[in-house]
């Protein structure tokens, strides 16, 4: 009896011991990260803040279940309830974006794009993608990425005079190189994409049109940016960023044959068992995005971006392409004699989080850069409006002006401390996850 009682107590401990007691080091890191998120202004364009419901789904017992395959066609038993979660995620994604097919299993943005390449291309095939220096992504053909190693990549870019896509030049290049696939979309392009023109170019050369809308999916869902689904053969998107869900990816399309190829490419082509706790959280996020309040959110994200860009321009900074039509902007720091590396560090010391980013035709090295990329999704989720983002623009300028005076990597401690105090006062007005204590 004593042995049985001891065994029972051991298992009770396993199931009931809190993270704080079981692993104080990880618990401490999580609490510190919560404090950072609460007291810093998050301007990284690819980041957002999920709801309590999404957190609960992602932290659920769904993490225990293996479910190789697809709903109704699994290689494991006991999948009847995870099937419900995945089917809900699929149906909600289809409704949200008005498409016929959705694969919600990709674990990341890189994997969703790899799946499309696996489905539609052969090694050595030619595809076109936006150059990294013009706002593209590593998976759009960068030579250091699989996409640039396995395929012949023809990059297109923006015009030097206005930093906008030159559709005539893209069309000319497509006719000259005859790509099998044209990839539209990017991570640092702040203007509206002309999906219709891209499809016309693709059709003229017999290419697939693939759109990576990872950054703007939330704006598409909210009706703020035109949808690529009526035009593209296949669309990929992450489920976080402006869509405000858990970190992951998905693939959307309207053609049944392409959908079958995508499903085979994801599983068994690239992945094994899907992350069912993440898929459950995706379903929750898609359900949130289907509510009328999400349209208001998306509209606010875009309006706040315009307010921030306008405020920054008033302080003497340049915005690449002159402004923004979506959630992000590239800020040219050269008017303040700053580099992206120095600015990111100085702003970080003032509790403003962003990332250094190259600008088109940047003379600086990739780890230095002449710019920073800023975005409004996380701040908008928190409750910031246009007034707050105009204030944030001024705070950024204060830090950069102090940095210009100091002219060193160490920055201007007095200015940064003063701005940090203002940032904390602002964030305290918009509490984050108060139920966590």
From Swiss-Prot:
It is an enzyme of class 2 (transferase). InterPro entries: PyrdxlP-dep_Trfase, PyrdxlP-dep_Trfase_major, PyrdxlP-dep_Trfase_small, Ser_HO-MeTrfase, Ser_HO-MeTrfase-like, Ser_HO-MeTrfase_PLP_BS, SHMT-like_dom. It is found in: Cytoplasm. The keyword Cytoplasm applies. Its cofactor is pyridoxal 5'-phosphate. Its EC number is 2.1.2.1. GO terms for biological process: glycine biosynthetic process from serine; tetrahydrofolate interconversion. Pathway: One-carbon metabolism; tetrahydrofolate interconversion; Amino-acid biosynthesis; glycine biosynthesis; glycine from L-serine: step 1/1. Transmembrane segments: none annotated. (6S)-5,6,7,8-tetrahydrofolate binds at residues 132, 136-138. Its main location: cytoplasm. The modification N6-(pyridoxal phosphate)lysine is found at residue 241. The record marks 240 as: Plays an important role in substrate specificity. The keyword Transmembrane helix does not apply. Keywords: Amino-acid biosynthesis, Cytoplasm, One-carbon metabolism, Pyridoxal phosphate, Transferase. GO terms for cellular component: cytosol. It catalyses: (6R)-5,10-methylene-5,6,7,8-tetrahydrofolate + glycine + H2O = (6S)-5,6,7,8-tetrahydrofolate + L-serine. Homodimer. Catalyzes the reversible interconversion of serine and glycine with tetrahydrofolate (THF) serving as the one-carbon carrier. This reaction serves as the major source of one-carbon groups required for the biosynthesis of purines, thymidylate, methionine, and other important biomolecules. Also exhibits THF-independent aldolase activity toward beta-hydroxyamino acids, producing glycine and aldehydes, via a retro-aldol mechanism. Belongs to the SHMT family. This is Serine hydroxymethyltransferase 1. It comes from Mesorhizobium japonicum (strain LMG 29417 / CECT 9101 / MAFF 303099) (Mesorhizobium loti (strain MAFF 303099)). The lineage of its organism: Bacteria, Pseudomonadati, Pseudomonadota, Alphaproteobacteria, Hyphomicrobiales. The gene is glyA1.
